[in-house]
A protein has these predicted regions:
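Methionine residue identity
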Residues: 1, 34, 40-41
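Polybasic, lysine-rich low-complexity intrinsically disordered segments
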Residues: 15, 27-30, 48
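PLP-dependent class I/II
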Residues: 46-62, 67-72, 79-92, 98-114, ...
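Conserved N-terminal alpha-helix of the aminotransferase class I/II PLP-enzyme fold
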Residues: 123-158
Length: 456
């Protein structure tokens, strides 16, 4: 639209708005006459007028929550990865924690059996069917000797991510402050941003063996409590940690619960990788601590333990007030996971658990191959005690370029895709996350590619 036409559209727009301000049913003929007169005088196509009106109106609309979200840095690597594959390149993909193995057959069989029952195809229950919540209670009793009230302290979720985001939506008031480790699984911080809250980032420092530097972590919490206004209302913890693989022992949670009770904040614990452990390590639960239910909830997912990532099943348990808030918001938002999936998940949690050890053994072997072959290639990495990741510091010659540019370079030159550490927080920029989702031979091939890349 030229400048002259724009001026005429603006003239028409202002006059029409003036006419509409005095609009009454009995004056409709006058308004129509005004429109026809203005069109004739200005010699304008009606489409230009409509486009101008809506462009002006919609340009004024802002989406404040979306504006607060940072750019999703993983998208840049994903786009580059797809471009390489479209060009015919063989990309070895360690970028996403997406299990590549099959769901154990007895779980699949139960799903099929349940699907073949017509009554299971209707709406389900937003908090999860009672049998699944009972299975969650059985799992916690067997693994942690923790008793749960199935009606007040357990909600089944569509994966742990859905449950976490909806919990945060339910409990966050505008301006509430949450303490979140950095680096962290991105939604752990961004859920509070979406809910209108704010985030105080706690630097996650590790010991040489990648256990958590607990002294430093508690020091950072105490500083946040002392210096922040308003005082933090929530703390998020995630061990075994994604992305760093950091682990803790039960005394860590005992001290954390004591501080939370004293300082009056809630703890949201994520133990998504609780079963993927190696070398005798056993993941503790915060709910093992006496009195933890006063201040804490905990989430878990079947995605990694049973290779059920696409099934979208998890649960959240613990503090009855927080669980009640999650249950209430879910009652408005969904009707629960497809019932046959819940039935099959019940079997997963309660029947033969040998499949869990088999899946864990697959990751242990991959871990050993990855650590050994990467070190031999000239990239020193630390062997994790848990999770499906290796948190690898960028080799010294490339560290100054940052994790995003290094990830791009590794992809284009070595044909190996990893996740840049900056995507998990500013303190992760010296690292990349490597997911153990390719088989052992592919891992060895990646190491050969990396060795050549580092030498060049």
């Amino acid at each position: 639209m030229g400048a002259e036409t724009s001026e005429r559209v603006a003239f028409w727009h202002l006059n029409l708005r003036a006419a509409l301000c005095h609009f009454r049913v009995e004056n409709i003929r006058k308004v129509i006459d005004m429109i026809l007169f203005l069109l004739m005088m200005q010699q304008l196509p009606i489409l230009n007028i409509i486009n101008f009106h809506y462009k002006t109106m919609f340009d004024e609309i802002e989406f404040d929550k979306i504006k607060r979200l940072p750019k999703y840095v993983f998208a840049a690597v994903n786009e580059l990865k797809m471009a390489e594959r479209r060009a015919g390149e063989d990309v070895i993909d360690f970028s996403m924690g997406n299990p590549d193995g099959p769901t154990p057959q007895h779980i699949v069989d139960k799903l099929i059996e349940s699907i073949n029952k017509p009554r299971t195809h209707g709406y389900s229950v937003s908090k999860g069917i009672y049998k699944l919540r009972g299975a969650v209670g059985t799992w916690y009793k067997r693994k942690y000797n923790v008793d749960l009230d199935l009606d007040r302290e357990v909600v089944a979720t569509m994966g742990s991510k859905e449950g976490y985001v909806h919990l945060v939506q339910a409990i966050t008031n505008p301006g509430d402050l949450a303490m979140v480790p950095d680096p962290c699984y991105p939604i752990h911080s961004q859920a509070f941003i979406l809910a209108g809250g704010n985030v105080h980032r706690l630097k996650l420092e590790l010991n040489d063996d990648f256990t958590l530097d607990e002294e430093g972590f508690f020091r950072n919490i105490e500083k946040a409590l002392r210096e922040s206004s308003p005082k933090p209302k929530y703390l998020v913890v995630n061990f075994p940690n994604n992305p760093t693989t950091a682990t803790v022992e039960l005394p860590f949670y005992q001290k954390l619960v004591d501080i939370a009770r004293q300082e009056r904040f809630y703890i949201i614990s994520d133990i998504a990788y609780a079963e993927l452990t190696f070398d005798g390590y056993v993941t503790p639960s915060i709910l093992q601590v006496p009195g933890a239910k006063d201040v804490a909830v905990e989430s878990y997912t079947l995605s990694k333990t049973y290779n059920m990532a696409g099934w979208r099943v998890g649960f959240m348990v613990g503090n009855a007030k927080l669980i009640g808030a999650l249950e209430k918001i879910k009652s408005w938002l969904d009707y629960g996971t497809f019932t046959p999936i819940q039935v099959a998940s019940t079997i997963a949690l309660t029947e033969d658990q040998s499949c869990v050890q088999e899946i864990c053994e697959v990751y242990r072997k991959r871990r050993d191959v990855m650590v050994k072959s990467f070190i031999n290639a000239g990239w020193p990495v630390v062997s994790p005690r848990a999770s499906m990741f290796v948190w690898a510091q960028i080799p010294e010659p490339f560290r100054s370029m940052g994790s995003l540019e290094f990830s791009k370079k590794l992809l284009t030159e070595a044909k190996v895709a990893v996740s840049p550490g900056i995507g998990f927080g500013a303190y992760g920029d010296d690292y990349v996350r490597v997911a153990m989702i390719e088989n052992e031979e592919r891992i060895r091939q990646a190491a050969r590619n990396i060795k050549k890349f580092l030498r060049e």
